[in-house]
Amino acid sequence: DNLTKTPLRASHVIMIIMKRSKEVKIREVEEIAAVSCAVQNMYLTTTVYGIGAYWNTGGVTYMEPAKQAFNINEEDRLMGFFYLGKKKGTYLEGKRKPIEESVEWIDDYNTEL
């Protein structure tokens, strides 16, 4: 039931596909990371323009028939759907710790880990 109703909740849906590079041999994990960074940039852009956005990686994303239905090559990967539309309400204000609580700087390269 969610598979048929979820896409209707957004005015636009962008399919996120990682298309493997054939000319240059890049590790798959690096291509997945590159696509993820691109989606993050899309998300940041929608936030600036006040557009609601959501990246869904569930549902049909991991179903093999979906790759066939959308003509996705075997070596490529369906990485989800990016939903766009009018946002309901306002975004919650972020609560961040000072960076010093999350980062440890290493000044000496000879330091044993």
Task: Place the predicted regions along the sequence by residue.
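Aromatic/hydrophobic pocket-lining residues that form π-stacking "cages" and hydrophobic walls in ligand
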Residues: N41-M42
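C-terminal helix-cap and adjacent tail motif
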Residues: L78-L113
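GST superfamily/GST-like fold recognition
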Residues: I26, E30, I51-P65
